[in-house]
């Protein structure tokens, strides 16, 4: 059974409220939280997918020094995608080649299983035309092609330029 690598966390954040939002501070905080969706934040060990249950921890926001912005502590529940090495995930195959299998996790995150992490006895079947992709045939006769779901084990995580790439393995399948 695959993990989803989804976790709920409750976090306290110190956020600003622009002068134009001073009459509706909840809207200001929601805008802050919206901008954090699909971002990896230092205080949250993973990528924020959703948030809920915003609570103000102070009765009023504070204006700091000569800033036009006010600041307030809030507590928010966040849904976080945080895969770890060894997690079992499921992805939808979107690319099949002799060098790797590409997948989408949750329809959002890219994953790649390189040839060295595909069982040695699996066979790559070349495409019939240049417009098709190939297919992998497993040792029990199953055909893996774009659109099919595939379980794999997380072998590593790469984060570059704000993007997360999951590296997987099937070697123990």
Swiss-Prot record:
Gene3D superfamilies: 2.40.50.1060, RNA polymerase Rpb7-like, N-terminal domain
GO cellular component: cytosol; nucleolus; nucleus; RNA polymerase I complex
Keywords: DNA-directed RNA polymerase, Nucleus, Phosphoprotein, Transcription
Keyword Nucleus attached: yes
Cellular location(s): Nucleus, Nucleolus
InterPro entries associated with the record: RNA_pol_Rpb7-like_N_sf, RPA43_OB, Rpb7-like, Rpb7-like_N
Source organism superkingdom: Eukaryota
Pfam families according to UniProt: RPA43_OB, SHS2_Rpb7-N
Post-translational modification remark: Contains an average of four phosphates per molecule.
Biological process according to GO: transcription elongation by RNA polymerase I; transcription initiation at RNA polymerase I promoter
Its biological purpose: DNA-dependent RNA polymerase catalyzes the transcription of DNA into RNA using the four ribonucleoside triphosphates as substrates. Component of RNA polymerase I which synthesizes ribosomal RNA precursors. May be involved in recruitment of Pol I to rDNA promoters.
Subunit structure: Component of the RNA polymerase I (Pol I) complex consisting of 14 subunits. Part of a Pol I subcomplex consisting of the subunits A14 and A43. Interacts with ker1/A14.
UniProt family annotation: Belongs to the eukaryotic RPA43 RNA polymerase subunit family.
Protein name: DNA-directed RNA polymerase I subunit rpa43
Organism of this sequence: Schizosaccharomyces pombe (strain 972 / ATCC 24843) (Fission yeast)
